[in-house]
Design a protein with these regions (language model features):
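Short alpha-helical segments that sit at the start of domains
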Residues: 1-5
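Positively charged interface segments
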Residues: 10-89
C-alpha cells in the first residue's frame, strides 16, 4: 500500500482536494493490476488510509460531494473517477 501511495501517476496529495473512497480504491486496484500485485480487500485498504491519514495529510470525511465517504487532501487520476468527479489531478 505504501508503494501505491507514492505512485503519482495514480494519486496526488493536495490540501484543497477531496476524493471518494471508492475512487481511491479503484485507482489502487488499477495500480495493483499494472504492477502485478494482489490487491488487499477494500475494507483493509480503507483501514490503512485511516491509520496513516496523518502521514499523508489526509482527513476522513463522510461528506465528500455532500454524501460520500472519502478523504480530503487527495485526488486520483481522472481515469479512476466518474466524469462528474471533482478531481483536480
Amino acid at each position: 500500500l505504501t508503494q501505491f501511495m507514492q505512485a503519482t501517476a495514480y494519486v496526488r496529495f493536495k490540501p484543497d482536494t477531496e476524493e471518494r473512497s471508492t475512487y481511491l480504491y479503484r485507482a489502487y486496484t488499477k495500480w495493483c493490476e499494472d504492477n502485478l500485485e494482489s490487491p488487499v480487500p477494500q475494507k483493509k485498504f480503507s483501514q490503512f488510509l485511516l491509520k496513516n491519514a496523518g502521514k499523508y495529510g489526509l482527513t476522513f470525511s463522510k461528506h465528500i460531494e455532500g454524501k460520500y465517504r472519502g478523504f480530503r487532501g487527495v485526488c486520483v487520476h481522472p481515469a479512476f473517477a466518474a466524469a462528474y468527479s471533482n478531481s483536480t489531478f
